[in-house]
């Protein structure tokens, strides 16, 4: 871990648990190296990591000097190596990561090396949270039944993880039914200060989920990366990035009565998206921090991917210490955190000088009002009072012209009719909000008030409560609010991501028939962080993000075609109208309930048994041995082809000639569009493959659970039912046109035809290509389809990195140019000029030849951003690079 003391900065710090060594940032100040006192706190953490890890090979003295002299106005475009202290994984991205490690071990043996060289060198925690689905709901049996179904569907994956637990050191699995990875990280895993070999240093991490940034609320630097990049970190590689710009977000005032942390984060997301912070750090500062609970901070940090930032950081301060105490962390750890951060100049107080920032924004918390976001993007905020007119305005965008049909829900227990805007899913879900006691207690109090007035959930609404940790269940029970939530159909359905990631399960059949029969624009209201098309449920077109109390309110109303500020939710038994304002809890009522229902003993009790898991987990045994025994008949875990027949040395970089366009897409194409996580259709290429292997459609599970099998995932790439390939106007789904035949076919089948003829492929895209989840299979699947370059107006940070990590060339149109302006429609043949002299961000010429002989020449910017990424690209990917290095060592 610690490799040297080049600056003479090593010192000793006394704590209540004894002395620790550390690397003094103040030594740099004493030596006249930089103005550290006014650096952003997030940059100070990166600086400490460089100072501690100087070895003049991976990390040099120049790296320390460059960060210490960070220029706020124009940070130098210099590559910074960062060695995170640990890695967190969730199972949808974690299983394929461990599959890759197993495949690397197999490849190492084929290359004559020691397979044990492939082993995590930093602590890795995998939390199983992505597999539970909402099959049963509104029942006291829902939790147990959904858990049983989860194990039935995923037993093979879980057996594989059991093998991984035994085969790899530094690797821990947190079993199903414990919670959501980011909430578990916040409440349990994060120490804020780590100690290794007697050296104390700031906790830091990367995670295979974009919402890893939630931990920034605790003062821990961490962000989401693709699985392939996380695997490289596990194997001892640093993260390389350009020196970041840091945007300061100044908060003042306090949240007003009636507004929640959810309203705040939707406001901040809208502001920061407009400010364009992709690839930048955001750091919150100002007097408003003193009135924000740590849970509120975590909510703001969680949605950094939605506003586009790498991190959304809050410095460690007195509230951090109080949170550590409230969540049952050991007193000696809290003492170490306080002493270490104060000694290092990393501890914020009201009197701390405001840091220097590249740019700043400001928000008075008093200006935050009740809000929602949707129907397609989290940055599209809508004031609650404007929901009705905004809904009317959105309807034509879903193809509705004229009057909305009214359809009977036939076969349901209660006779009902629904129309456009019917809320068919109301889900209290996602670590973004279930980690925040104020909004969870608020939802419970609103439910209690609603039940007291005789209100009920609309019968067509599929309602669910999926807390991010078991502690939530305990404090709701202690506050006496669980029974009211149960009465409205918000029984706990599982401890995992559920609806937020598309695991909403099927709609009740009568509701599904009504929606499809009437071609209704049905709606979902969820307390999640993403609402992209096709994500929540394939039958739900309009998706709105809202606070947990508003989720309960809309479950009662049963429609978004309503103005909750002026129209009643329903009537009480006496026929009196009941309005939202009548049942909305006051801030004081929420604060009192939080104070009386929560204590550190809850966290100690629940997390004291976190590693044991439910009985279903304890019964599973994995195979033995350092090498995984691949089963050719498995439909869940297969050895991926990435390292099979890999040459010892890489070939020189060459141009791409005679390429065809496989897919052409517009702006904001998400990783969900590229590699969906949800259900597998029986008539899709992946569905047909599974049926050919003897898997019945009811046993397909979902794409996310099949990520250990490249055969399924390659067929599922660009298979989202809401994908709009502009090469096939008027269609949705995974279809394209094969050239020169002109045949309309599935994207997978077209790719295989091109492969058979040795034709390389490209993808054309608009702005924000690859936005959304950190999903490395969006890059892996792209590569396995034969795509060698993606030409886009702009890229989201993680997906660009993942493409490079898989050896796919990201090219960006020059400012003012685009697919449209150049007249590219996907029928062209592309030649991309490239050779072994490639350097970061160089100009790359592209020639597109049209069928009529016209030739379009244009220049792009190569989005291989750093020198080490050139090395990765030359080797065919980051893991290929690491494997070759380890094989030679």
What are these regions (language model features)?
Residues 55-254, 261-266, 370-373, 387, ...:
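Long, structured ligand/cofactor-binding scaffold of large enzymes
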Residues 572-587, 799-872:
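Acidic, glycine-rich flexible loop/linker segments
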